[in-house]
Structures are given as C-alpha cells and as structure tokens.
Swiss-Prot record:
Shikimate binds at S20, R21, S22, T67, N92, D108, Y225. GO terms for biological process: amino acid biosynthetic process; aromatic amino acid family biosynthetic process; chorismate biosynthetic process; shikimate metabolic process. It comes from the Bacteria. Gene3D superfamilies: Leucine Dehydrogenase, chain A, domain 1 (3.40.50.10860), NAD(P)-binding Rossmann-like Domain (3.40.50.720). One of its GO terms (cellular component) is cytosol. Its EC number is 1.1.1.25. NCBIfam families: aroE, PRK00258.1-4. One of its GO terms (molecular function) is NADP binding. Pathway: Metabolic intermediate biosynthesis; chorismate biosynthesis; chorismate from D-erythrose 4-phosphate and phosphoenolpyruvate: step 4/7. This is Shikimate dehydrogenase (NADP(+)). It catalyses: shikimate + NADP(+) = 3-dehydroshikimate + NADPH + H(+). It comes from Cereibacter sphaeroides (strain ATCC 17023 / DSM 158 / JCM 6121 / CCUG 31486 / LMG 2827 / NBRC 12203 / NCIMB 8253 / ATH 2.4.1.) (Rhodobacter sphaeroides).
C-alpha cells in the first residue's frame, strides 16, 4: 500500500452541493492541525446513492457528511444507526468501519446546543418553555436536543399542521402543536425561541411572524445563516433578547465527524468562524 492510499478521505454528499460550507470548514481544520487528509464535495443523485455509498470505502473514504436530500435515505442504507439518528429519522454523519459496516449518526442536535452554550452562556433551557417554528428534519434534531437538556415544554408551529402533528406523535407530551397563524401568540414566557424554517434565507420568503409577545429574557436563534443577521434576529435583538445566529450550529455539528475521521477534536472558535465566512 502506498503512502497516498493511506491518506484518509472524507466528504459531503448531497444534491445540489455547490453551496456547502463543509469543504471550507474541514479543509481549514486539516490545515490548522497539520493533518493528512482530504475532504471532497460530491453531488450525488438519489438514484446513485446506494452505489456511491458502497463504493466510497473501497476508494479510501473513512466517512462523510450527508446533506439534502439524502439525510433520511441513508438511515435505511446504514448497517448501524445511533439511537438519536433513529429518533430524528435522519443522519448527517457516516463512519465507514474497517469491518465494512456503515455507521450513521446525527450530530445536528448536539451542534445546536453547543452553539447556544458557547454564544449564549447564560442560557438555561430548563427555565421555561421553548418555541420551535418548523417541523422538518432540522426541527426534529432541535426538539430531540431540547428534550435532552430538560426544556419543560415545546410549543411547535409549522405551516403544515399535519407534519407538526406527526412530529408530536414521535416525541411525546412535551410537544404542543399550534396552528401557524398562532406562531407569534405562543411566545409569551418562552425562554428559548428557534426558527428551523427556511423563512428569511436568501432567495426564500421573508420571516414575518409577529414578535410582540417575545420575552426579552429569551434566547432567540435562527438556523438560517445566509444571511447571518436575519430579520428575526434583528427584531429579537431590538426587543432585548440574546440572539445567536445559525453558523455556529454548522461548525459544532461538524466537529464529531472530523474527530472520528481524522483523529483530532477540532476547536470551534472565532478563528474557525472567520475562516468559513471568508470563503
């Protein structure tokens, strides 16, 4: 075996993939820590997913990140699925074992809580209800994480009521579903507020939920990070809230996979953030 074939490969699979910041992030960490390795973005069509996953270990890949639209599909293709990935119903991190088995995990929830703990140090999730807007895959990861850290109640609103009801049936009595027209009315006394929808993202409709009932003691975070300062965060900051943008979640969710693939737990700090924003 040559030296070249021993260099670990990782990557991110999705479609489209050109927008992903993951290659810049992992490339920065590899350079920062002086590690041998490569991180490669791959545009993979749904029809090719099974064949690509089967081929990657033979090509020297030790694992990969997974993004839209494959996060749910890879659950059924993995040999071993962590409990949290099974609960969420999606995986964003794959590890290719030396035994040939594919291990699937979901680090979105831990990335979410790590981002809040780093950038809102006074955040106390047990101190009051949480409001979550959206009921997609990101919302599932966030709700699982909020339950794990002890949030007493989760008020969920989504533009499709049926999706929110399905999510409640999976996560249990702590989740209370509200119609989307009530999205602003469920803010009273909430201590954590999370937008998991694409509203406010570049190229998407603007976020227009009224925030009059927002608790100024709440921590407000938006998973959207393009733009970094969304309308929600600007208005919440004006109301006196501590606000946290969505870029930190992307950075923190990436760290566990990088450690598994390349053997070093990377720091998520201002230098990391600046390197990703510069791309």
């Amino acid at each position: 075996m040559t030296e070249l074939t021993r260099i670990p490969l990782a990557g991110v699979i999705g479609s489209p993939i050109a927008h992903s910041r993951s290659p810049a992030l992992h490339g920065y960490w590899l350079k920062r820590y002086g590690l041998k390795g490569h991180y490669i973005p791959m545009d993979v069509a749904q029809a090719d997913l099974r064949d690509v996953l089967a081929a990657m270990p033979r090509m020297g890949f030790v694992g990969c990140n997974v993004t839209i639209p494959h996060k749910e599909s890879v659950i059924g293709l993995a040999d071993i699925v962590t409990d949290r990935a099974a609960l969420i119903g999606a995986a964003n991190t794959l590890i290719f074992g030396k035994d040939g088995k594919i291990h699937a995990d979901n680090t979105d929830g831990t990335g979410f809580t790590a981002n809040l703990r780093q950038n809102a140090p006074a955040w106390q999730p047990q101190s009051g209800p949480a409001v979550v807007w959206g009921a997609g895959g990101a919302a599932r990861a966030v709700i699982a994480a909020l339950i794990e850290v002890g949030v007493p109640e989760i008020r969920l609103a989504n533009r499709s009521r049926a999706r929110a009801d399905a999510l409640r049936s999976d996560f249990g009595a702590k989740v209370h579903v509200h119609d989307w027209v009530q999205a602003g009315n469920i803010l009273e006394d909430a201590m954590t507020v999370v937008n998991t929808t694409s509203l406010g993202m570049v190229g998407k409709p603007e976020f227009r939920v009224p925030l009059d009932a927002l608790n100024p003691k709440a921590v407000v975070t938006d998973l959207v990070y393009a733009p970094l300062r969304t309308r929600l965060l600007v208005e919440a900051e004006a109301a006196g809230c501590r606000t946290v943008d969505g870029l930190g979640m992307l950075l923190h969710q990436a760290a566990p996979g990088f450690e598994r693939w390349f053997g070093v737990r990377p720091e998520v700090d201002e230098e990391t953030r600046a390197a990703v924003l510069a791309t």
